[in-house]
Amino acid sequence: MSKRDYYQVLGVPRTASEDDLKKAYRRCAMKYHPDRNPGDAAAEAAFKECKEAYEVLADTKKRKLYDTHGHAAFEHGVGGGNAPDMNDIFGDIFGNIFGGARASRRGADVGYMVELDLEEAVAGVERQIQIPTLVECTHCHGSGSEDGHVETCGTCRGSGQVRIQRGIFAMQQTCPHCGGRGVIIRNPCKVCNGAGRVEDHKTLSVKIPAGVDNGDRIRLSGEGEQGPEGVPPGDLYVEVRVREHPIFQRDGDDLHCEVPVRISQAALGDIVRVATLDGEAEIRIPAETQSGKLFRLRGKGVRSVRSRTEGDLYCRIVVETPVNLTAEQRKLLEQFEMTFAGEDARKHSPKSATFLDGVKSFWDRMTS
């Protein structure tokens, strides 16, 4: 199974201190803990991923191994303490039936998170990102040997696999002598310590398509970690996180916003201008509009990244109570209020009428 970079999982830089790691793990654990997300398989998987990342990075020796060799440091039991991936186990046993496990090996996948403004997510954007990765050691040219000399493993004869007979079953598994590499290095490279790869950073240009949303992932084939002994590199997965917008809330391809209006506008009707992602639009508010009324502007939402259809913009009216009144404004409002004296509230205030009817019905039931 492809694994994300442990630092990316916890959301910390590679220079993070022990306290930073502990705080990041606590946040992650609280967010994805199964007790907080009952029945959520995705949250359970994320919790296990956070736990695995912290167990490695919180251990000084394991962290040093991981920083040098990446996930490869813990494959096939190397590094100690970590349980092997079940997919790797079955790959060791049955891999050669389908062409050999060693032939299918490649570098680890890498995860990266990019934050966008809503406008960038809607319109699409090109971003330059710098990612930590493992690349071929230029000192030994990936051989892992200081003098360039490697010996073919005598146990597996260079295949990286050994055949084991268990009763009537013959199985293939990773060679315990060379760890699946197929070669023995007597004089390890002083730069990469025999790994054949070193840690580096590379800058990539990522084109993020219009319409992406929170959690969407973009796959860049072959931009992950370089595999050992020249095998193909893994992939890079760029995950999108969209920042909160001060005006709009996104729901799929639709957008929602609140439009404040004055009492007089709501009572008498008016035309108000509202912001959209591509400028402004007008809403005609009829007289006697109540707070909470929704108006839909078709096609003013987000263009879907998959179907290319456009969502809508829903504007919710919020009737505001005026503040900081002048003496004259207060006097006019008092005069306006006096015009309701003796009037039935049901005539002018439909919600008040409903409320009063509910109160009366409640007390009638209580006293009957």
Swiss-Prot record:
A zinc finger (CR-type) spans 124-201. GO terms for biological process: chaperone cofactor-dependent protein refolding; DNA replication; protein refolding; response to heat. Zn(2+) 1 binds at C137, C140, C189, C192. CXXCXGXG motif repeats lie at residues 137-144, 153-160, 175-182, 189-196. Its cofactor is Zn(2+). The keyword Zinc-finger applies. GO terms for molecular function: ATP binding; heat shock protein binding; unfolded protein binding; zinc ion binding. GO terms for cellular component: cytoplasm. The keyword Metal-binding applies. Its main location: cytoplasm. Zn(2+) 2 binds at C153, C156, C175, C178. Participates actively in the response to hyperosmotic and heat shock by preventing the aggregation of stress-denatured proteins and by disaggregating proteins, also in an autonomous, DnaK-independent fashion. Unfolded proteins bind initially to DnaJ; upon interaction with the DnaJ-bound protein, DnaK hydrolyzes its bound ATP, resulting in the formation of a stable complex. GrpE releases ADP from DnaK; ATP binding to DnaK triggers the release of the substrate protein, thus completing the reaction cycle. Homodimer. Belongs to the DnaJ family. The J domain is necessary and sufficient to stimulate DnaK ATPase activity. Zinc center 1 plays an important role in the autonomous, DnaK-independent chaperone activity of DnaJ. Zinc center 2 is essential for interaction with DnaK and for DnaJ activity. This is Chaperone protein DnaJ. The gene is dnaJ.
